[in-house]
Design a protein with these regions (language model features):
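Glycine-rich, mobile lid/loop segments that gate access to catalytic sites or pores
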Residues: 105-168, 172-175
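A short local loop/turn or secondary-structure capping micro-motif enriched for an aromatic residue
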Residues: 36, 88-90, 175-178
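ATP-grasp fold ATP-binding core
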Residues: 1-11, 40-61, 67, 141-145, ...
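Conformationally flexible catalytic loops at phosphate/diphosphate-handling active centers
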Residues: 177-186
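Glycine-rich phosphate-binding loop of ATP-grasp-fold ATP-dependent ligases
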Residues: 2-31, 66, 89-90, 154, ...
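Hydrophobic alpha-helical hairpins/lids featuring a short glycine-rich hinge
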Residues: 44-105
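Catalytic core of tubulin tyrosine ligase-like
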Residues: 23-43, 120
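Short beta-strand elements
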Residues: 4-6, 68-73, 80-83, 157-159, ...
Length: 186
């Protein structure tokens, strides 16, 4: 899989992601991308220039999920957003099937409580040992969110493989501009 590395979402729909079968296909697509301007719903009409690509191994996917942590502007609270409809733009899911998006507010002083992590995992359709793995992932993501002064940490998609493994295929991380001085290495 060849993925354009730009600071914008919607790369797949914008033509910035392609599954290739051969080395020649990979070279051709990467050459086409590098130096081009990728236009997505988040970039505006001018697009963003692609200077790098990521080459990743393709994996078999059983189910695509969505998981994000953000600051809910209407409540000014940290919120975990989850959906069984991963791999597409969450705005689309919200418009067409809002009942498939679940939100859980988190107290920053307490962090993600065990019952909250478990409930989010269950809402994602994870059961048994997968719910345990999902709960652990959720708690670890929250820790990353707090430690790095994030305003958004979005996994789309989080995939379930046929072997029942959870794999983060794409992640977006936005750092709060007011805290960037604390995050020099980022």
């Amino acid at each position: 899989v060849i993925k354009a590395q730009v600071l914008a979402g919607g790369r797949g729909k914008g033509g910035g992601v392609k599954i290739v079968e051969t080395l020649d296909e990979a070279k051709a697509f990467a050459s086409k991308l590098i130096g081009s301007f990728l236009i997505t719903a988040q970039t505006g009409k001018k697009g963003i220039q692609v200077n790098k690509v990521l080459v990743a191994e393709a994996i078999d996917i059983k189910k695509k999920l969505y998981l994000a942590i953000s600051i809910d502007r209407s409540t000014s609270k940290i919120t975990i957003i989850s959906s069984t409809e991963g791999g597409t733009e969450i705005e689309e899911v919200s418009a067409k099937t809002p009942h498939k998006i679940l939100k859980e507010q988190i107290n920053p002083l307490l962090g993600v409580l065990n019952f909250q992590a478990r409930q989010i995992a269950l809402n994602l359709g994870l059961t048994g040992s997968l719910a345990t793995k999902g709960s652990s992932l959720i708690k670890n993501l929250f820790k990353i969110f707090i430690e790095n002064d994030c305003s958004l940490l979005e996994i789309n998609p989080l995939v379930l493989t046929p072997d029942d493994e959870l794999v983060v295929l794409d992640i977006k991380m936005d750092i709060d501009d007011n805290a960037i001085f604390r995050q020099k290495e980022l």
